[in-house]
Amino acid sequence: MTRAVKPRRFAIRPIIYASVLSAGVLLCAFSAHADERDQLKSIQADIAAKERAVRQKQQQRASLLAQLKKQEEAISEATRKLRETQNTLNQLNKQIDEMNASIAKLEQQKAAQERSLAAQLDAAFRQGEHTGIQLILSGEESQRGQRLQAYFGYLNQARQETIAQLKQTREEVAMQRAELEEKQSEQQTLLYEQRAQQAKLTQALNERKKTLAGLESSIQQGQQQLSELRANESRLRNSIARAEAAAKARAEREAREAQAVRDRQKEATRKGTTYKPTESEKSLMSRTGGLGAPRGQAFWPVRGPTLHRYGEQLQGELRWKGMVIGASEGTEVKAIADGRVILADWLQGYGLVVVVEHGKGDMSLYGYNQSALVSVGSQVRAGQPIALVGSSGGQGRPSLYFEIRRQGQAVNPQPWLGR
């Protein structure tokens, strides 16, 4: 009996050991899963915090972009007024130069009249001496002398009246010159004020750009910038499409009118005669005839180094749809051909943009401008200044972004440029 009981007691120990070991393994497993869950929660919390930070920075960036737009629009307006003031000042200087020349001429005339008057007075005096002798010698000669004296008296009176008139003219010119100089002083004061205002705005803009650059470095550069570039391009296309739609009726009407002129020319040729279009009709046909085949016939919008070419890699799979030309800030941007302005506005990524329609689905686009010199609906001629080079849209240096679009699609603009 005793031998039978002992083995049963010894058999329980391995079971207990196995149970304890199994429980330990399970506890370790539960502990590991708990650690993983905690780690996952921590990672998720970090991700959520980073997402909130990114959203906050994006909101700050959007706010700064809005401020950047206002600053650049204000600089554009200040630059335009500065240019107008300078033009007015140049005109006043020209008027003052003309008045000075007129005064000098009048002074010369006055001196000549005074010399002539002195000669006449001397002649009259000499005639008076001869008249005394003639009174003794002959009564008839005496009468002749009296007539000569009367003649010289009238002549002297006329000379005195001329001198008085010249003096009056000189006083009037002096008054006008004083008035012009006063206006010039006012213009100079306004010019100084505007320059100070522009300097203040430029400083504020530079500060905004620095803040914007700091935010950009804290946001993911790759996909974020790629998405933004796509959005900028989409906004540009939409803005152009809206501008085209708004100008469509006028463009179609002008195209019909231009075709009517061409039909009249053809009809005249068929009849063996000629039809000479008016200047207005010539301008109409020129600005609605499109850019034609690229043969280097168009004006360069601005002269300078090409910083980016059409088709170069921009970001990821995105390519430049136009070209970027470096130039000094304030350089005149010229229309490449005749046309009509359909867009002059600030667009994110492109700054202040001017778009000119040339007819037959062709248009040219000018971006990054400091100031626009034309407005929507303006007719422009080839080589006419339409904007001033700038760095709007947050660009790092003054330059011009230039595109040519044909039937809504961006094409390589380089082959058209040559003049």
UniProtKB/Swiss-Prot annotation:
It comes from Escherichia coli (strain K12). InterPro entries: Cell_wall_metabolism_enzyme, Dup_hybrid_motif, Peptidase_M23. Disruption phenotype: Mutants show defects in septation and separation, and form very long filaments (1.5-fold increase). The phenotype is exacerbated when combined with nlpD (over 8-fold longer), more exacerbated with a triple mepM (yebA) or ygeR disruption (15-fold longer) and further yet by the quadruple disruption mutant (envC-nlpD-mepM(yebA)-ygeR, over 21-fold longer). Quadruple mutants are less sensitive to ampicillin lysis. Changing residue 321 to A: Retains AmiA and AmiB activation. One of its GO terms (molecular function) is metalloendopeptidase activity. Residues 35-124, 155-271 form a coiled coil. Residues 252-270 have a biased composition (Basic and acidic residues). It is found in: Periplasm. Belongs to the peptidase M23B family. It comes from the Bacteria. It holds the Pfam family Peptidase_M23. GO terms for biological process: peptidoglycan-based cell wall biogenesis; response to radiation; response to xenobiotic stimulus; septum digestion after cytokinesis. The coiled-coil domain is necessary and sufficient for recruitment to the divisome. The LytM domain is required for proper septal peptidoglycan splitting. Changing residue 401 to E: Partially unstable, loss of AmiA and AmiB activation; does not complement double envC-nlpD disruption, protein localizes normally. GO terms for cellular component: cell division site; outer membrane-bounded periplasmic space; periplasmic space; plasma membrane. The keyword Membrane does not apply. This is Murein hydrolase activator EnvC. Keywords: Cell cycle, Cell division, Coiled coil, Periplasm, Signal. PANTHER family: MUREIN HYDROLASE ACTIVATOR ENVC, PEPTIDASE-RELATED. Residues 252-290 are annotated as: Disordered. Changing residue 366 to H: Partially unstable, loss of AmiA and AmiB activation.
